[in-house]
């Protein structure tokens, strides 16, 4: 799916909440972001920065570096205070985000996707670095 001009286009930085409630079937079904992004890179094992997130009020920031070709992004759409997070604080609706680096979902069923088959003689390894810092 091409992201240009859609709520899924984060190539130019903007707040996650800017378009989270856009008139889009995928966003409505997921009550927000819960999609996999193709990272437009080769599956060559090189670790590169694939995304950054920044909270301007506190200056908290995070970069994600990986050797993977895709990333799942979830915006806490089904948290309702039922479950506790850090320090026993209830997890509220859209109060958190998740970034999971990975291969393409359902790749095992698509011969045109990079293989995710691991044979008994192979070892699996991938790298994901979450770099936290303050940016002012």
Residues covered by each model-derived region:
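Active-site pocket scaffolds in enzymes
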Residues: 5-136
């Amino acid at each position: 799916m091409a992201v240009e001009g859609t709520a899924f286009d984060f190539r130019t930085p903007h707040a996650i909440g800017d378009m989270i409630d856009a008139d889009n079937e995928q966003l409505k079904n997921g009550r927000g972001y819960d999609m996999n992004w193709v990272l437009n890179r080769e599956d060559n094992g090189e670790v590169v920065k694939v995304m950054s997130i920044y909270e301007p009020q506190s200056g908290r920031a995070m970069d994600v570096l990986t050797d993977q070709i895709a990333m799942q992004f979830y915006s806490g759409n089904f948290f309702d205070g039922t479950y506790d997070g850090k320090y026993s604080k209830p997890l509220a609706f859209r109060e958190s985000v998740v970034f999971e680096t990975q291969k393409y979902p359902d790749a095992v069923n698509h011969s045109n996707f990079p293989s995710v088959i691991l044979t008994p003689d192979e070892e699996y390894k991938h790298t994901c670095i979450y770099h936290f810092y303050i940016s002012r």
